């Protein structure tokens, strides 16, 4: 036997290297085979519900790192709630209708207009489902736990029927209407868009300054006067029917020396406009308030059949332009509102493809709207005063990335204005985890217009509306419920398979159809109505869920998307928000803080992270950032997180190894019988438990990460485990001191493994497989630990807080001695302490081997004043010298009692007593050489 064999060196097969990329799929299959999600649900049956409702990602392509952050966050919440006394089911969902899938099929060579519509929709459905299953596998690879066999998908018959019923209730309440209002129109998609389907980019446009000649000045202006207008959309002049001024803005009538004409502009802008137009010696002839110019009539710049009326509008400013805007009610929301109020014609001169129509005039007909500037300039002639290129923020179709226009077309709307206050009141009852989130959603609802819910596409849920022979729209409770029942059985494709009369209830009649003939609507619903109905299709329709949901968690872009549409439909139907809480997240940026883009080559695919690091590192990264704001991610950042993971793993490996001979049923030492330092560590750990439990409850992942890493680095590695080897390796295997420390080790190991499970389930299960005395076969089936409190807890904490200050001072003294070459490592030191009464009382209260805690070989507490050469602090001073004696081959301390024993061992008296008591046979035979 060798002397080293008398040490209690920790033993474990738990590997230092995790091998996550290869091991994670094996564990995930094991969980699936063991039906862990179902078993967890059975354990939680009857407990209070916590329902996090999954906002459905769009089923197209593999998931990106933003998806990963969002879904890992959801998984952490679901797992922590499931382990905290809640019935927390997770039903993953997918959004499957809409233009992107039509675009994919078009790229694959599918020609929608040349094939049977039902066959085309079948192809859309097949592709969408293939993408659902692809993304499902992507999410499962992240280690997510959920009901993967009972997904919700917006194309299933039950979901489509539920969506129709949401629409039906809104129709019954009078919230659905048809109108020809300007809407965001995407010529590239040939469809109307909702606000949630646009994004803003900088666009360079040609802006024109031109003049309308006064035709009837109403006794205010002469007919040789021209009103100066500014536009950034020259094509809309073809549909201009008025000029709008601000009622309280001052306007001036001016005569430039170089002009025979007189002009009207905003007084505030005269100087800048004079410079722009090259006007010199400008004479101000008169000043008018905008309201004085109301109802003056001007000529259209070139269309002699059209007069343009001066009207008042609150949207006019003097921030730019001339303070006067031309008004084309068919091409803008503000234009429409003031135009209708003043009886202006709503002219639309651009078709659905962005092509100018005949009513724009023969010179324009057939041109693309954005290419007509030269023709407009030619038509304006000397009415054009200036032109310039400007860069401004402009709306684009978020799917095709092409600019859009406002265009008045007949559409179906949901009237938000009819129940806006009800929605705002519902927002006040929701808990927002960021105050700005509440303000953002509130302002969006307060300021938004009515919702355009119709789309001129094929792949989607049909609007369940019929038309009588006289054109009357039919959407009664009876007809809509009948359609819902048909969809429930056959799916929405039946709408296209049957004639209108075969989709109506048997025997249905309508006074507008004396011949019994009907037509059906060919528009489909906005996809935001699809996902915005999920509270009904999922929360209401599934018996194991609750409505409203406890939490919606999505990216901050969903304040104008899913949060918004779900809120509108839920309040319209039931008067309540579909969620009790909203938690939003920022976007994922690259390591430099730049937006990720395939064209820039700075994206990170979750699959690449899984191959290089493992999903566990991605999960840990999610907790290491404040995801309520935009966050950075790169392979370098993940490499740093991987180092943190390695530290966590190897710390827990040390605990596993050094409790391998510990049986908690037999070897646990009661708290009251622990040493003071062990009590301190037990209390500190329970403070960590409380911090983490509270942070899980508040979804504060970064708090968990910081607290956990700090505890492992500072409390364990830099202190408790730093001197632990002196006890667990050297003392007798069954000694009280060793069992005291092992009691703390084991308690921390078991509980920290449970606390880690929501974040690092793979690693937690791997650790759990080494804890043979724990009852549950999987840690995921256990409960999160409760924080304990102990008698005299504050007193113990105060004592050890003071000791940590003392320890820091001692380490400074040791460092000075090391720099002076008095010692090398701290175990070579004999530390003499010169304490005042406060420190002396402290060291007595610590009631531990202080030399062991400071990792020095010898320590003396001296009486009297410290020598001049001492390292002094306010309450204590230290001197350091090399310890007397020689190194013990067993404990490595320098000790005056170290000597060669008769059994061929050079060890100190303390080690000799342990060896002689526990290894009598080896002592009798003598130890082998090293």
From Swiss-Prot:
Question: What InterPro entries would the database entry show?
Answer: aa-tRNA-synth_I_CS, aa-tRNA-synth_Ia, Anticodon_Ile_BEm, Ile-tRNA-ligase, Ile-tRNA-ligase_type1, Ile-tRNA_ligase, M/V/L/I-tRNA-synth_anticd-bd, Rossmann-like_a/b/a_fold
Q: Which residues bind ATP?
A: 598
Q: What class of enzyme is it?
A: ligase
Q: Which HAMAP family match?
A: Ile_tRNA_synth_type1
Q: Which cofactor does it need?
A: Zn(2+)
Q: Which family does it belong to?
A: Belongs to the class-I aminoacyl-tRNA synthetase family. IleS type 1 subfamily.
Q: How does this protein assemble?
A: Monomer.
Q: Name one GO cellular component term.
A: cytosol
Domains (record comment)? IleRS has two distinct active sites: one for aminoacylation and one for editing. The misactivated valine is translocated from the active site to the editing site, which sterically excludes the correctly activated isoleucine. The single editing site contains two valyl binding pockets, one specific for each substrate (Val-AMP or Val-tRNA(Ile)).
Q: How is the cofactor bound?
A: Binds 1 zinc ion per subunit.
Descriptive protein name: Isoleucine--tRNA ligase
Sum up the protein's function in the record's words.
Answer: Catalyzes the attachment of isoleucine to tRNA(Ile). As IleRS can inadvertently accommodate and process structurally similar amino acids such as valine, to avoid such errors it has two additional distinct tRNA(Ile)-dependent editing activities. One activity is designated as 'pretransfer' editing and involves the hydrolysis of activated Val-AMP. The other activity is designated 'posttransfer' editing and involves deacylation of mischarged Val-tRNA(Ile).
Reaction equations catalysed: tRNA(Ile) + L-isoleucine + ATP = L-isoleucyl-tRNA(Ile) + AMP + diphosphate
Q: Where in the cell is it found?
A: Cytoplasm
List the signal peptide residues: none
The record's listing under PANTHER family reads:
ISOLEUCINE--TRNA LIGASE, MITOCHONDRIAL, SOLEUCYL-TRNA SYNTHETASE
Alphabetically sorted, this entry's keywords are: Aminoacyl-tRNA synthetase, ATP-binding, Cytoplasm, Ligase, Metal-binding, Nucleotide-binding, Protein biosynthesis, Zinc
Per the record, the domain of life is Bacteria
* Chain location of the short sequence motif 'KMSKS' region per the record: 595-599
Q: Which GO terms describe its molecular function?
A: aminoacyl-tRNA deacylase activity; ATP binding; isoleucine-tRNA ligase activity; tRNA binding; zinc ion binding
Q: Which CDD domains match?
A: Anticodon_Ia_Ile_BEm (cd07960), IleRS_core (cd00818)
Q: Where is this motif: 'HIGH' region?
A: 57-67
